[in-house]
């Protein structure tokens, strides 16, 4: 207890003459975060561009700014994700708003956009995309921004109205309103009823089994369970989508489906795909940055 009191007094003492270098050191010492996150916090509080923070280390912070740093540090020390504290996450190079109703975009999910971009560049016609279980909309928004000239439309769908509110804000912030659509749907139910057909499906569905003991404790504590867990060993949503491909994909043309999957799910999914699709479609499994099998990619 005495150590905490001393530390607190020290924090308020350095508040009077703290510059950005001191603030960075304070965050690294007290918050269990890396340097890039510490720079992001300083950028957020001071409004200095991220790329300029390290060139501005002698700039003195005012008391209000340093109090904010202490407050953020305390939240981080308790395990609260930085993205939820700041209210956004940089995904690829795009600023994506998030809150407790959306999953935090992960680095490994970024590769989905690369697979889609490669496919789009090989097509001659304009493309219609469905971002299913969209959460914050980070995947569909990145695809839309990076392929504006080739987009027919992008539809964002999720069961959570609160998540879709964040999606809508991200769409507005990136000037994508005119050629995007937001649909509240219990997975594919409303999508199929509307009878729209798509060239591309991207989907990072709930895929963690309810009994999985490997789930990160802080992920389980802070992120929405609705977006994390699925029945049938976490495979329910993949199977539902695959069984209904012809009801929402434009199978008269080239199609691309990219799922993010759990690293232990490849074998079960492969067996199911062989039983359900036979030779009608081609599929492969690809690894993420960390050498884990993370993507199911399906084409016609």
From Swiss-Prot:
GO terms for molecular function: nucleic acid binding; protein-(glutamine-N5) methyltransferase activity; protein-glutamine N-methyltransferase activity. It catalyses: L-glutaminyl-[peptide chain release factor] + S-adenosyl-L-methionine = N(5)-methyl-L-glutaminyl-[peptide chain release factor] + S-adenosyl-L-homocysteine + H(+). One of its GO terms (biological process) is methylation. CDD domains: AdoMet_MTases. InterPro entries: DNA_methylase_N6_adenine_CS, HemK-like, N5-glutamine_MTase, PrmC_N, RF_methyltr_PrmC, SAM-dependent_MTases_sf, Small_mtfrase_dom. Keywords: Methyltransferase, S-adenosyl-L-methionine, Transferase. Pfam families: MTS (PF05175), PrmC_N (PF17827). Substrate binds at residues 204-207. It is an enzyme of class 2 (transferase). PANTHER family: HEMK METHYLTRANSFERASE, MTRF1L RELEASE FACTOR GLUTAMINE METHYLTRANSFERASE. This is Release factor glutamine methyltransferase. It comes from Mesoplasma florum (strain ATCC 33453 / NBRC 100688 / NCTC 11704 / L1) (Acholeplasma florum). The gene is prmC.
């Amino acid at each position: 207890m005495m150590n905490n009191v001393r530390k607190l007094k020290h924090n308020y003492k350095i508040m009077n003459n703290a510059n950005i270098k001191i603030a960075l050191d304070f965050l690294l010492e007290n918050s269990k975060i890396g340097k890039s996150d510490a720079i992001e916090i300083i950028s957020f509080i001071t409004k200095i561009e991220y790329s300029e923070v390290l060139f501005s280390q002698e700039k003195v912070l005012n008391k209000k700014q340093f109090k904010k740093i202490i407050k953020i540090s305390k939240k981080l020390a308790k395990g609260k994700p930085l993205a939820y504290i700041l209210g956004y996450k940089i995904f690829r190079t795009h600023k994506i708003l998030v809150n407790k109703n959306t999953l935090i975009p992960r680095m490994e999910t970024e590769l989905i956009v690369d697979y889609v971009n490669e496919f789009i560049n090989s097509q001659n016609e304009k493309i219609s995309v469905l971002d299913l279980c969209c959460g914050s909309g980070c995947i569909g928004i990145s695809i839309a921004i990076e392929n504006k000239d080739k987009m027919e439309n992008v539809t964002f769908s999720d069961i959570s109205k609160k998540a879709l509110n964040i999606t809508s804000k991200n769409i507005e912030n990136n000037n994508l309103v005119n050629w995007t659509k937001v649909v509240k749907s219990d997975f594919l139910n409303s999508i199929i009823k509307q009878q729209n057909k798509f060239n591309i499906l991207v989907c990072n569905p709930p895929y963690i089994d309810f009994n999985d003991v490997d789930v990160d404790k802080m992920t389980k504590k802070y992120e929405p369970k609705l977006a994390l867990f699925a029945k049938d060993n976490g495979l329910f949503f993949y199977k539902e989508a695959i069984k209904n491909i012809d009801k929402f994909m434009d199978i008269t043309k080239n199609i691309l489906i990219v799922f993010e999957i759990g690293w232990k799910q490849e074998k079960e999914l492969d067996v199911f795909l062989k039983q359900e699709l036979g030779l009608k479609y081609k599929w492969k499994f690809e690894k993420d940055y960390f050498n884990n099998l993370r993507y199911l990619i399906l084409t016609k």
